[in-house]
Amino acid sequence: MAATVGVSLKRGFPAAVLGRVGLQFQACRGAQTAAAAAPRIKKFAIYRWDPDKTGDKPRMQTYEVDLNKCGPMVLDALIKIKNEVDSTLTFRRSCREGICGSCAMNINGGNTLACTRRIDTDLSKVSKIYPLPHMYVIKDLVPDLSNFYAQYKSIEPYLKKKDESQEGKQQYLQSIEDREKLDGLYECILCACCSTSCPSYWWNGDKYLGPAVLMQAYRWMIDSRDDFTEERLAKLQDPFSVYRCHTIMNCTQTCPKGLNPGKAIAEIKKMMATYKEKRALA
């Protein structure tokens, strides 16, 4: 008698064949699970300095993070280190969405936001993290932005009207075309990535306003609702406020929002030339 072969009701495959396939599938899944469970250790070398500790000097401290148990962004790794490894690690962070600019720092040689910079998954490379360059450091990855904000305040970054009699009583309208002129300017989040990547700002940060502040100055200069364009230009009539920009363009390259501060500064220079000509003829 012929041997009886079990047949599956699904497409008529012999049960023995399906059994072997099932075993192979289970073995494959087991291998994948084992591979997924294997630690993926990434090293982070992070700048550390605590001024409250007597004799403490700036140093780099290395931490190890299993990328299988960490989110994809550098900020995820920093939070994991602080929560699970070293609670003394200090850094700024807030929105985690690239909106607030709090977590600006220098990662692998470039200024960016830790919340939007993906972790380099090459495990053979050590990711190096520093505070924003050429700034006084408060602690670890926290720079002192006091001068930066004071410069921002100095440009009076708000709408100014010469006739304030209607203030609060009517809307200040502008055309769609005039509103579109502000695109690429108002989106600045004041993270200071651009200013702290600028060599001119490194050496003249006390006098040169820097890319971020100048871009915001330009934003208010060209706002059709503002009445103080000439006064804003007059405040920049010195050798340092604007003219320390040498179009190196580090600012545009590093901006995490994809803005172009270098172009805005060039436009201010053109406005300054026209302003000087008008003053000479007056």
From Swiss-Prot:
<feature type="transit peptide" description="Mitochondrion">
    <location>
        <begin position="1"/>
        <end position="30"/>
    </location>
</feature>
<comment type="function">
    <text>Iron-sulfur protein (IP) subunit of the succinate dehydrogenase complex (mitochondrial respiratory chain complex II), responsible for transferring electrons from succinate to ubiquinone (coenzyme Q). SDH also oxidizes malate to the non-canonical enol form of oxaloacetate, enol-oxaloacetate. Enol-oxaloacetate, which is a potent inhibitor of the succinate dehydrogenase activity, is further isomerized into keto-oxaloacetate.</text>
</comment>
<feature type="binding site">
    <location>
        <position position="251"/>
    </location>
    <ligand>
        <name>[3Fe-4S] cluster</name>
    </ligand>
</feature>
<feature type="binding site">
    <location>
        <position position="245"/>
    </location>
    <ligand>
        <name>[3Fe-4S] cluster</name>
    </ligand>
</feature>
<feature type="binding site">
    <location>
        <position position="100"/>
    </location>
    <ligand>
        <name>[2Fe-2S] cluster</name>
    </ligand>
</feature>
<keyword id="KW-0560">Oxidoreductase</keyword>
<feature type="binding site">
    <location>
        <position position="191"/>
    </location>
    <ligand>
        <name>[4Fe-4S] cluster</name>
    </ligand>
</feature>
<comment type="similarity">
    <text>Belongs to the succinate dehydrogenase/fumarate reductase iron-sulfur protein family.</text>
</comment>
<dbReference type="GO" id="GO:0009055">
    <property type="term" value="F:electron transfer activity"/>
</dbReference>
<keyword id="KW-0496">Mitochondrion</keyword>
<feature type="binding site">
    <location>
        <position position="95"/>
    </location>
    <ligand>
        <name>[2Fe-2S] cluster</name>
    </ligand>
</feature>
<keyword id="KW-0999">Mitochondrion inner membrane</keyword>
<dbReference type="GO" id="GO:0045273">
    <property type="term" value="C:respiratory chain complex II (succinate dehydrogenase)"/>
</dbReference>
<dbReference type="InterPro" id="IPR001041">
    <property type="entry name" value="2Fe-2S_ferredoxin-type"/>
</dbReference>
<dbReference type="GO" id="GO:0006099">
    <property type="term" value="P:tricarboxylic acid cycle"/>
</dbReference>
<dbReference type="GO" id="GO:0005743">
    <property type="term" value="C:mitochondrial inner membrane"/>
</dbReference>
<feature type="binding site">
    <location>
        <position position="203"/>
    </location>
    <ligand>
        <name>a ubiquinone</name>
    </ligand>
</feature>
<keyword id="KW-0004">4Fe-4S</keyword>
<feature type="modified residue" description="N6-acetyllysine">
    <location>
        <position position="57"/>
    </location>
</feature>
<feature type="binding site">
    <location>
        <position position="194"/>
    </location>
    <ligand>
        <name>[4Fe-4S] cluster</name>
    </ligand>
</feature>
<dbReference type="InterPro" id="IPR017900">
    <property type="entry name" value="4Fe4S_Fe_S_CS"/>
</dbReference>
<keyword id="KW-0472">Membrane</keyword>
<keyword id="KW-0809">Transit peptide</keyword>
<feature type="domain" description="2Fe-2S ferredoxin-type">
    <location>
        <begin position="42"/>
        <end position="135"/>
    </location>
</feature>
<dbReference type="InterPro" id="IPR036010">
    <property type="entry name" value="2Fe-2S_ferredoxin-like_sf"/>
</dbReference>
<dbReference type="InterPro" id="IPR009051">
    <property type="entry name" value="Helical_ferredxn"/>
</dbReference>
<keyword id="KW-0479">Metal-binding</keyword>
<dbReference type="InterPro" id="IPR025192">
    <property type="entry name" value="Succ_DH/fum_Rdtase_N"/>
</dbReference>
<dbReference type="GO" id="GO:0005654">
    <property type="term" value="C:nucleoplasm"/>
</dbReference>
<protein>
    <recommendedName>
        <fullName>Succinate dehydrogenase [ubiquinone] iron-sulfur subunit, mitochondrial</fullName>
        <ecNumber>1.3.5.1</ecNumber>
        <ecNumber>1.1.5.-</ecNumber>
    </recommendedName>
</protein>
<dbReference type="GO" id="GO:0051538">
    <property type="term" value="F:3 iron, 4 sulfur cluster binding"/>
</dbReference>
<feature type="domain" description="4Fe-4S ferredoxin-type">
    <location>
        <begin position="178"/>
        <end position="208"/>
    </location>
</feature>
<dbReference type="GO" id="GO:0042776">
    <property type="term" value="P:proton motive force-driven mitochondrial ATP synthesis"/>
</dbReference>
<keyword id="KW-0001">2Fe-2S</keyword>
<dbReference type="GO" id="GO:0051537">
    <property type="term" value="F:2 iron, 2 sulfur cluster binding"/>
</dbReference>
<dbReference type="InterPro" id="IPR004489">
    <property type="entry name" value="Succ_DH/fum_Rdtase_Fe-S"/>
</dbReference>
<dbReference type="InterPro" id="IPR017896">
    <property type="entry name" value="4Fe4S_Fe-S-bd"/>
</dbReference>
<feature type="binding site">
    <location>
        <position position="255"/>
    </location>
    <ligand>
        <name>[4Fe-4S] cluster</name>
    </ligand>
</feature>
<feature type="binding site">
    <location>
        <position position="103"/>
    </location>
    <ligand>
        <name>[2Fe-2S] cluster</name>
    </ligand>
</feature>
<dbReference type="GO" id="GO:0005739">
    <property type="term" value="C:mitochondrion"/>
</dbReference>
<feature type="region of interest" description="Interaction with SDHAF1">
    <location>
        <begin position="148"/>
        <end position="220"/>
    </location>
</feature>
<keyword id="KW-0408">Iron</keyword>
